[in-house]
Amino acid sequence: VLGWIIGEVLGIDPLGIKVVTGDTDLTPVDLGSYSSRVTLMTGNAAMQAAERARELLAKGVGEKLGIPAGRLVFADSRVFDAEEPKLGMTFQEAVVCTEARFGTIGTVGSYTPPTSPAKFRGGGVGPSPSYSYSATVVEVEVDPLTGIYRVPKIWMAHDIGRALNAAVAMGQIEGGVYMGLGEAMMEEQVYRDRTHKGNRIFVHRIPSMLEYKQPTGLEMPEIVTYVVEDPDKNGPFGAKEVGQGPLLPIMPAVANAIFDAVGVRVDENPVSFEKVFAALQSKADGKEARFGPSNGPDGVPKVDFGDSLKIKTPWQGGDGTAWNEPKREKKAAK
């Protein structure tokens, strides 16, 4: 994706661009590529660096050909006059003449997310100017006697902003479906609870990757993919992430589809056949038709999170302040 962004700015074939792994010898310390931030954040930085290189090249070519730099077009691996397209040179020639005029061409780009306008406690955590959205429909077939089920078909729609490479984007979306299906159906690490020298420790019940199941071609369903393009002004050429987003709705969709089919809830991942069978047995015995952690002392503890904060949007006249945030006492410095 970074190569495609740079290629689009400079008007050259992305296959001729080499993207190397950066390190702190060449670049400043970066927070990382987690949370599907490469296309948006690194993409914006790459675009800025490419635009600076294009500006320098335009100046060099403009002086060489006697053409105003603002009239030059970068396309089809050439740099040419917008008014007289035949007047120009190849991109390689543009690099040579610019280096002869200004020396080695080296430009940098950076990107910092905009500061969050939120003034309430925790409002500045993990700011991002844009987010992707996904929606999915999962079809399941469940055996009401055994709890064994299969997923024959999944429909997945993902708002990508703009697809910089449609084929790769669809592959990413379907890869997210694959990952989500693995988490929903079978991926699990089972531990033994042991005490050693007074310390409570956990060890794998079956320490083998053979027992960490993932979907194969036999388990993968038919996937109908919808790439929803709504360009985002904050992304490079309007693009947003297409990495982790598509996997998120798969797990709740599988659980909801099973409930719709046989009327039982499984409230923990993976939604294995054994858990569905246990929930079916509980339902048949007249008990709660569910399987999952209880709300008792050994289950999920109840946590009082308090009232939700209420923040008016800018168009409602808000300034980022939560009008119902509890006041915090200031402690005197010692």
Predicted regions: what they are:
Residues 1:
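Flexible, small-/acidic-enriched active-site or ligand-binding loops
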